[in-house]
Protein backbone atom coordinates (compact mmCIF):
# COMPACT_ATOMS: atom_id res chain seq x y z
CA UNK A 1 0.00 0.00 0.00
CA UNK A 2 1.40 3.38 -1.01
CA UNK A 3 0.52 6.40 1.13
CA UNK A 4 0.91 10.05 0.17
CA UNK A 5 0.39 12.79 2.72
CA UNK A 6 -1.20 15.36 0.44
CA UNK A 7 -1.95 18.29 2.79
CA UNK A 8 -1.52 18.43 6.56
CA UNK A 9 -1.18 20.97 9.35
CA UNK A 10 2.51 20.13 9.60
CA UNK A 11 2.77 21.51 6.03
CA UNK A 12 1.21 24.81 7.19
CA UNK A 13 -2.47 24.30 6.27
CA UNK A 14 -5.54 22.99 8.05
CA UNK A 15 -5.99 19.61 6.42
CA UNK A 16 -5.56 15.88 6.85
CA UNK A 17 -5.86 14.94 3.17
CA UNK A 18 -4.28 11.57 2.39
CA UNK A 19 -3.99 9.50 -0.78
CA UNK A 20 -3.86 5.70 -0.63
CA UNK A 21 -2.95 3.51 -3.58
CA UNK A 22 -3.91 -0.09 -2.90
CA UNK A 23 -5.36 -3.01 -4.80
CA UNK A 24 -5.09 -1.06 -8.03
CA UNK A 25 -7.28 1.75 -6.67
CA UNK A 26 -6.47 5.35 -5.76
CA UNK A 27 -8.38 6.55 -2.70
CA UNK A 28 -8.33 10.19 -1.59
CA UNK A 29 -9.52 10.83 1.96
CA UNK A 30 -10.84 14.19 3.16
CA UNK A 31 -10.01 16.44 0.18
CA UNK A 32 -10.32 19.74 2.02
CA UNK A 33 -8.05 22.59 3.09
CA UNK A 34 -8.25 25.87 5.00
CA UNK A 35 -5.70 28.46 6.09
CA UNK A 36 -4.16 28.19 9.53
CA UNK A 37 -5.26 29.86 12.77
CA UNK A 38 -3.99 33.31 13.80
CA UNK A 39 -1.73 31.82 16.49
CA UNK A 40 0.15 29.88 13.81
CA UNK A 41 3.58 31.55 13.51
CA UNK A 42 3.41 32.44 9.83
CA UNK A 43 2.24 35.75 8.31
CA UNK A 44 -1.36 35.78 7.06
CA UNK A 45 -0.27 36.21 3.45
CA UNK A 46 1.88 33.09 3.65
CA UNK A 47 -0.90 31.10 5.32
CA UNK A 48 -3.33 32.12 2.57
CA UNK A 49 -0.80 31.28 -0.14
CA UNK A 50 -0.21 27.85 1.38
CA UNK A 51 -3.95 27.14 1.46
CA UNK A 52 -4.27 28.09 -2.21
CA UNK A 53 -1.22 26.03 -3.13
CA UNK A 54 -2.44 22.90 -1.39
CA UNK A 55 -5.94 23.27 -2.79
CA UNK A 56 -4.36 22.89 -6.23
CA UNK A 57 -2.40 19.86 -5.04
CA UNK A 58 -5.60 18.29 -3.70
CA UNK A 59 -7.37 18.95 -7.01
CA UNK A 60 -4.56 17.27 -8.93
CA UNK A 61 -4.67 14.18 -6.70
CA UNK A 62 -8.47 14.03 -6.87
CA UNK A 63 -8.36 14.14 -10.64
CA UNK A 64 -6.57 10.78 -10.77
CA UNK A 65 -8.40 9.19 -7.81
CA UNK A 66 -11.06 6.50 -8.17
CA UNK A 67 -12.64 6.88 -4.74
CA UNK A 68 -13.13 9.98 -2.58
CA UNK A 69 -13.95 9.70 1.11
CA UNK A 70 -15.39 12.48 3.27
CA UNK A 71 -15.36 11.62 6.98
CA UNK A 72 -17.29 14.71 8.10
CA UNK A 73 -18.34 18.11 6.82
CA UNK A 74 -15.88 20.60 8.27
CA UNK A 75 -14.30 22.74 5.56
CA UNK A 76 -10.76 21.48 6.15
CA UNK A 77 -12.06 18.01 5.19
CA UNK A 78 -14.08 18.76 2.07
CA UNK A 79 -14.29 21.46 -0.58
CA UNK A 80 -17.82 22.63 -1.32
CA UNK A 81 -17.46 23.51 -5.01
CA UNK A 82 -18.97 22.29 -8.23
CA UNK A 83 -15.57 21.12 -9.37
CA UNK A 84 -15.23 18.38 -12.00
CA UNK A 85 -11.55 17.89 -11.19
CA UNK A 86 -12.50 17.02 -7.64
CA UNK A 87 -15.73 15.10 -8.01
CA UNK A 88 -16.34 14.27 -11.66
CA UNK A 89 -17.06 10.54 -12.23
CA UNK A 90 -15.85 9.58 -8.74
CA UNK A 91 -17.17 7.05 -6.27
CA UNK A 92 -17.98 9.21 -3.24
CA UNK A 93 -18.15 7.53 0.19
CA UNK A 94 -19.60 9.89 2.79
CA UNK A 95 -20.43 10.41 6.41
CA UNK A 96 -24.22 10.06 6.71
CA UNK A 97 -25.58 13.59 6.10
CA UNK A 98 -28.78 12.99 8.11
CA UNK A 99 -28.02 10.66 11.03
CA UNK A 100 -25.61 11.15 13.93
CA UNK A 101 -24.84 14.65 12.76
CA UNK A 102 -25.18 18.08 14.35
CA UNK A 103 -27.11 20.92 12.77
CA UNK A 104 -24.07 22.77 11.43
CA UNK A 105 -22.63 19.72 9.68
CA UNK A 106 -26.07 18.68 8.41
CA UNK A 107 -26.54 22.06 6.72
CA UNK A 108 -23.04 21.87 5.24
CA UNK A 109 -23.70 18.31 4.03
CA UNK A 110 -26.94 19.35 2.35
CA UNK A 111 -25.19 22.28 0.67
CA UNK A 112 -22.33 20.06 -0.47
CA UNK A 113 -24.57 17.35 -1.94
CA UNK A 114 -26.65 19.94 -3.78
CA UNK A 115 -23.50 21.63 -5.10
CA UNK A 116 -21.89 18.45 -6.49
CA UNK A 117 -25.16 16.83 -7.64
CA UNK A 118 -24.64 14.97 -10.92
CA UNK A 119 -20.82 15.03 -10.81
CA UNK A 120 -19.93 11.83 -8.90
CA UNK A 121 -20.59 8.48 -10.53
CA UNK A 122 -21.73 6.94 -7.23
CA UNK A 123 -22.59 8.46 -3.84
CA UNK A 124 -22.86 6.12 -0.85
CA UNK A 125 -23.31 6.63 2.89
CA UNK A 126 -20.40 4.88 4.62
CA UNK A 127 -21.16 4.87 8.37
CA UNK A 128 -20.34 1.44 9.82
CA UNK A 129 -20.08 -0.16 6.37
CA UNK A 130 -17.42 -2.17 4.55
CA UNK A 131 -16.68 -1.86 0.83
CA UNK A 132 -14.65 -4.44 -1.11
CA UNK A 133 -13.00 -3.96 -4.50
CA UNK A 134 -10.59 -6.52 -6.03
CA UNK A 135 -8.85 -7.57 -2.82
CA UNK A 136 -9.08 -4.11 -1.26
CA UNK A 137 -11.23 -3.61 1.83
CA UNK A 138 -12.34 -0.17 3.02
CA UNK A 139 -14.06 -0.35 6.39
CA UNK A 140 -15.70 2.56 8.19
CA UNK A 141 -16.27 2.98 11.90
CA UNK A 142 -19.59 3.82 13.38
CA UNK A 143 -19.79 7.56 14.12
CA UNK A 144 -17.19 8.65 16.67
CA UNK A 145 -17.17 11.88 18.65
CA UNK A 146 -15.23 14.79 17.16
CA UNK A 147 -13.33 15.05 20.43
CA UNK A 148 -14.95 14.51 23.82
CA UNK A 149 -18.28 12.80 24.33
CA UNK A 150 -21.17 15.22 23.89
CA UNK A 151 -19.19 17.84 21.96
CA UNK A 152 -21.21 20.19 19.78
CA UNK A 153 -18.69 19.51 16.99
CA UNK A 154 -20.58 16.32 16.18
CA UNK A 155 -19.29 13.04 14.79
CA UNK A 156 -16.68 11.73 12.35
CA UNK A 157 -15.84 8.40 10.72
CA UNK A 158 -12.53 6.61 11.06
CA UNK A 159 -11.37 4.66 8.00
CA UNK A 160 -9.63 1.27 7.92
CA UNK A 161 -7.92 0.47 4.60
CA UNK A 162 -6.74 -3.11 4.14
CA UNK A 163 -4.79 -4.44 1.15
CA UNK A 164 -4.10 -8.13 1.68
CA UNK A 165 -2.38 -8.45 5.05
CA UNK A 166 -1.46 -4.77 5.24
CA UNK A 167 -3.78 -2.54 7.27
CA UNK A 168 -3.84 1.21 7.90
CA UNK A 169 -6.19 3.31 10.04
CA UNK A 170 -6.97 6.96 9.38
CA UNK A 171 -8.70 8.32 12.49
CA UNK A 172 -10.09 11.61 11.16
CA UNK A 173 -10.86 14.26 13.80
CA UNK A 174 -10.99 12.31 17.05
CA UNK A 175 -8.98 15.15 18.65
CA UNK A 176 -6.21 13.13 20.22
CA UNK A 177 -7.98 9.84 20.97
CA UNK A 178 -9.56 11.21 24.13
CA UNK A 179 -12.56 8.86 24.11
CA UNK A 180 -12.35 5.11 24.74
CA UNK A 181 -14.36 4.11 21.65
CA UNK A 182 -11.79 5.56 19.26
CA UNK A 183 -8.90 3.92 21.11
CA UNK A 184 -10.62 0.54 21.39
CA UNK A 185 -11.24 0.56 17.63
CA UNK A 186 -7.53 1.00 16.91
CA UNK A 187 -6.43 -1.61 19.44
CA UNK A 188 -9.01 -4.11 18.15
CA UNK A 189 -8.08 -3.59 14.49
CA UNK A 190 -4.32 -3.54 15.25
CA UNK A 191 -3.13 -1.71 12.11
CA UNK A 192 0.37 -1.76 10.67
CA UNK A 193 0.24 2.01 10.22
CA UNK A 194 -1.80 4.72 11.91
CA UNK A 195 -2.58 8.27 10.79
CA UNK A 196 -4.06 10.07 13.78
CA UNK A 197 -5.32 13.50 14.72
CA UNK A 198 -3.58 14.94 17.77
CA UNK A 199 -5.34 16.99 20.46
CA UNK A 200 -6.11 20.69 19.82
CA UNK A 201 -3.70 22.04 22.40
CA UNK A 202 -3.94 25.53 20.89
CA UNK A 203 -7.39 25.61 22.54
CA UNK A 204 -6.17 24.63 26.03
CA UNK A 205 -7.89 26.64 28.73
CA UNK A 206 -10.61 27.68 26.29
CA UNK A 207 -12.36 24.74 24.62
CA UNK A 208 -9.90 22.01 25.65
CA UNK A 209 -9.29 21.10 29.30
CA UNK A 210 -5.88 20.04 30.60
CA UNK A 211 -7.33 16.81 31.97
CA UNK A 212 -8.40 15.91 28.44
CA UNK A 213 -4.84 16.52 27.27
CA UNK A 214 -3.74 14.11 30.00
CA UNK A 215 -6.30 11.54 28.83
CA UNK A 216 -5.08 11.94 25.26
CA UNK A 217 -1.49 11.32 26.32
CA UNK A 218 -2.39 8.13 28.18
CA UNK A 219 -4.52 6.86 25.31
CA UNK A 220 -1.89 7.49 22.65
CA UNK A 221 0.65 5.69 24.83
CA UNK A 222 -1.82 2.80 25.07
CA UNK A 223 -2.07 2.64 21.27
CA UNK A 224 1.73 2.62 21.00
CA UNK A 225 1.93 -0.22 23.53
CA UNK A 226 -1.00 -2.38 22.43
CA UNK A 227 -0.78 -2.28 18.63
CA UNK A 228 1.80 -3.11 15.99
CA UNK A 229 1.33 0.29 14.35
CA UNK A 230 4.71 1.60 13.25
CA UNK A 231 4.98 4.29 12.09
CA UNK A 232 2.32 6.33 13.87
CA UNK A 233 1.71 9.68 12.19
CA UNK A 234 0.31 12.23 14.64
CA UNK A 235 -0.67 15.53 13.07
CA UNK A 236 -3.59 17.86 12.28
CA UNK A 237 -4.89 19.77 15.37
CA UNK A 238 -1.74 19.16 17.45
CA UNK A 239 0.47 20.73 14.77
CA UNK A 240 -1.20 24.13 15.11
CA UNK A 241 0.69 24.75 18.36
CA UNK A 242 4.46 25.33 18.46
CA UNK A 243 4.45 24.12 22.09
CA UNK A 244 3.45 20.61 21.06
CA UNK A 245 6.85 18.90 21.65
CA UNK A 246 6.66 19.97 25.31
CA UNK A 247 2.93 19.43 25.80
CA UNK A 248 3.13 15.92 24.30
CA UNK A 249 6.58 15.32 25.77
CA UNK A 250 5.69 12.08 27.58
CA UNK A 251 4.32 10.48 24.41
CA UNK A 252 7.42 11.27 22.36
CA UNK A 253 9.64 10.03 25.19
CA UNK A 254 7.64 6.80 25.42
CA UNK A 255 7.76 6.16 21.67
CA UNK A 256 11.56 6.38 21.72
CA UNK A 257 11.70 4.09 24.75
CA UNK A 258 9.76 1.32 22.99
CA UNK A 259 11.33 1.87 19.57
CA UNK A 260 8.27 3.16 17.71
CA UNK A 261 8.36 5.91 15.09
CA UNK A 262 6.02 8.72 16.11
CA UNK A 263 6.19 11.41 13.45
CA UNK A 264 4.29 14.18 11.72
CA UNK A 265 3.31 14.00 8.06
CA UNK A 266 6.02 16.54 7.19
CA UNK A 267 8.63 14.49 9.04
CA UNK A 268 7.60 11.47 6.96
CA UNK A 269 8.59 13.66 4.00
CA UNK A 270 11.88 14.53 5.70
CA UNK A 271 10.86 18.11 6.51
CA UNK A 272 10.53 20.14 9.70
CA UNK A 273 6.92 20.88 10.73
CA UNK A 274 5.83 24.32 9.54
CA UNK A 275 4.75 25.39 13.02
CA UNK A 276 8.26 24.81 14.42
CA UNK A 277 9.94 26.42 11.43
CA UNK A 278 7.63 29.42 11.74
CA UNK A 279 8.31 29.75 15.46
CA UNK A 280 12.06 29.52 14.89
CA UNK A 281 12.03 32.12 12.11
CA UNK A 282 9.30 34.50 13.28
CA UNK A 283 9.20 34.09 17.04
CA UNK A 284 6.21 33.48 19.33
CA UNK A 285 2.63 34.56 18.73
CA UNK A 286 0.19 33.63 21.48
CA UNK A 287 2.44 31.77 23.95
CA UNK A 288 5.73 33.18 25.22
CA UNK A 289 6.43 30.82 28.10
CA UNK A 290 5.19 27.37 29.10
CA UNK A 291 6.25 24.24 30.95
CA UNK A 292 6.63 20.66 29.87
CA UNK A 293 3.50 18.65 30.58
CA UNK A 294 5.50 15.90 32.26
CA UNK A 295 4.47 12.82 34.23
CA UNK A 296 4.00 14.71 37.49
CA UNK A 297 1.84 17.32 35.75
CA UNK A 298 -0.29 14.58 34.21
CA UNK A 299 -0.78 12.85 37.58
CA UNK A 300 -1.70 16.09 39.35
CA UNK A 301 -4.12 17.11 36.59
CA UNK A 302 -5.94 13.76 36.57
CA UNK A 303 -6.18 13.61 40.37
CA UNK A 304 -7.74 17.06 40.47
CA UNK A 305 -10.20 16.12 37.71
CA UNK A 306 -11.23 12.99 39.64
CA UNK A 307 -11.65 14.99 42.86
CA UNK A 308 -13.94 17.40 40.97
CA UNK A 309 -15.96 14.50 39.50
CA UNK A 310 -14.99 15.47 35.96
CA UNK A 311 -13.70 12.00 35.05
CA UNK A 312 -14.03 8.55 36.67
CA UNK A 313 -11.32 7.40 39.08
CA UNK A 314 -10.39 4.55 36.71
CA UNK A 315 -8.18 7.06 34.89
CA UNK A 316 -5.82 7.09 37.86
CA UNK A 317 -5.08 3.40 37.26
CA UNK A 318 -3.59 4.27 33.87
CA UNK A 319 -0.94 6.59 35.28
Place the predicted regions along the sequence by residue.
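Core dinuclear metal-dependent hydrolase active-site scaffold
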Residues: 1-63, 112-181, 273-276, 280-319
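Active-site environment of divalent metal-dependent phosphoester hydrolases
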Residues: 13, 73-79, 99-102, 175-180, ...
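Short, flexible/disordered intra-domain loops and linkers
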Residues: 39-49, 104, 204-212
Amino acid sequence: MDVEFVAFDSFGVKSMCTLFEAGGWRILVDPGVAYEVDSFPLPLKERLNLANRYKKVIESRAETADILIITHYHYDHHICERNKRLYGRKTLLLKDPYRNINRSQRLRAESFLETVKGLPKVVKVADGKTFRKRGLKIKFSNPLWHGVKGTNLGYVLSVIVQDGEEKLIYTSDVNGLIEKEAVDLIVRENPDQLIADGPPTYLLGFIMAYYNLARSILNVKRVLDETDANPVVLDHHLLRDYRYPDLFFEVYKHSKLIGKRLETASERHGEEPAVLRGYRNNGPTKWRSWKKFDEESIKATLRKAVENNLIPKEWLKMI
